[in-house]
């Protein structure tokens, strides 16, 4: 399974590299704007680390509640689905609205919101993972979904604002591709692998199987939140270059 995962990822990475090289040959202007804009490049590197966490916690969220709170799949499905849908809706809409308001006052307003979203995702993620009661955990989970989706609109609009109008579809496509390669392809896989490692360790220490699986998954999900430091740091640097890159766009 591991070989197949990395083979598929390697093929995808090779295709992406070929696409970038092809863009450089076919459209030098597009290549320059996308890959030589420091603010845009830092953003494109930073954003997948957020989806690394959200895809991982999304993939193993139901299993976490089943293992740690002894809930049935149907109970988790109803509560988890409703909280995810409503919380994400509030996060996406509210994040976009607030991001536009911040942008009116600060040139880096949208980047500030994305960094706050990453920080809030870490705090609320720890909140729902380490709550002792299911009701408290699901309350944290609701706020987690608000925080973990609030950044999406600001990230997408920042990408399109840093390229010419004719290149917005290409830049958006690469943005989505980076989210998929870094987040969807690696987040659940690496977190699941870490969970298996912890589970084996706990079993070797004499912990019963159900408890070992519950604690192992909880620790793996909690430790995946550490990667949220990366986008906060990278976007902090991006704030230094955003205004200059926007000014150079139509210069």
What label would you give each PLM region?
Residues 1-3, 38-95, 148-152, 156, ...:
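Extracytoplasmic gate region of multi-pass secondary transporters
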Residues 1-6, 72, 107-112, 196-228:
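A membrane-interface helix-boundary motif in multi-pass transporters
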Residues 103-105, 159-168:
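Paired intracellular helix-loop junctions of major facilitator superfamily
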Residues 73-78, 165-175:
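Loop-to-transmembrane helix entry/capping segments in MFS-fold secondary transporters
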Residues 1, 16-44, 68:
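Juxtamembrane intracellular "pre-TM" segments in multi-pass secondary transporters
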Residues 107-158:
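C-terminal transmembrane helical hairpin of 12-TM major facilitator-type secondary transporters
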Residues 36-44, 134-138, 169:
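Primarily residues marking transmembrane-helix entry/exit sites
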Residues 122-131, 217-251:
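Multi-pass alpha-helical transporter architecture, strongest
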């Amino acid at each position: 399974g591991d070989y197949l995962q990395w083979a598929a990822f390697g093929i995808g990475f090779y295709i992406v590299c070929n696409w970038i090289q092809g863009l450089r040959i076919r459209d030098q202007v597009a290549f320059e704007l996308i890959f030589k804009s420091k603010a845009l490049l830092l953003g494109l590197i930073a954003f997948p680390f957020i989806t690394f966490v959200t895809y991982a916690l999304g993939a193993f969220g139901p299993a976490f509640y089943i293992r740690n709170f002894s809930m049935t799949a149907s109970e988790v499905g109803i509560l988890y689905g409703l909280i995810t849908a409503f919380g994400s809706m509030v996060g996406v809409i509210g994040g976009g609205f607030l991001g536009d308001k911040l942008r009116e006052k600060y040139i880096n307003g949208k980047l500030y919101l994305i960094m706050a979203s990453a920080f809030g995702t870490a705090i609320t993620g720890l909140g729902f993972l380490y709550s002792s009661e299911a009701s408290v955990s699901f309350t944290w989970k609701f706020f987690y979904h608000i925080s973990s989706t609030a950044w999406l609109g600001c990230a997408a609009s920042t990408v399109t604002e840093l390229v010419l109008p004719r290149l917005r579809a290409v830049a958006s496509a690469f943005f989505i591709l980076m989210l998929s390669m870094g987040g969807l392809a690696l987040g659940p896989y690496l977190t699941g692998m870490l969970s298996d490692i912890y589970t084996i360790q706990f079993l070797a220490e004499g912990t019963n199987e159900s408890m070992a699986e519950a604690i192992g998954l909880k620790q793996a999900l909690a430790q995946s939140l550490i990667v949220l430091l990366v986008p906060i740091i990278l976007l902090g640097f991006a704030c230094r270059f955003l205004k200059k890159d926007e000014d150079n766009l139509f210069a």
